[in-house]
Amino acid sequence: MTRRTSAGRPSPASHFPAIPFEHQPELRALMMFPTLPPGHMTFPVPDDAFYPHLRRGEFAVVDLADHQPAEGELFLITYRDQRIESGHVYALCAMHLKRSRVDPARTSWYARHSLPEAGAGVTLSEGPFTTEHAAEKLVGRVVGVWVPAR
């Protein structure tokens, strides 16, 4: 059956074959940066917990001005640790929002330390955090991967 427009002509879409969906893990949602923009920093990716977005050995590009939590977005978060000279530990996380079943206006944030899609059977998380507390702990949003120009 040929699709037709309202004028009775064959639809342009009928000339194009349907393309089946094919998962392509090598494609990413993050931009590749050959140079580091002002107001950004890099952070080494220690493992494949956030694959396919980030891979072990790469450097995540972190926007230091953007630290408001957002559902499903990757961030660099800081935790206090007095055993370390600087007093802080840094880690990559994906923020997850949960709403209270009793009061949907009440929300809390959790920092997941891996993506379920990355193959981890169990996802460790920290929280709950209020929006304000999460914003204080988040160093910045991961906006890309640093690939130095050669």
Where would I find each of the regions flagged by the language model?
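Extended boundary segments
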Residues: 1-30, 146-150
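Short boundary motifs at domain starts and secondary-structure transition points
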Residues: 31-35
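Acidic/glycine-rich C-terminal interaction modules and beta/coil loop segments
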Residues: 36-150
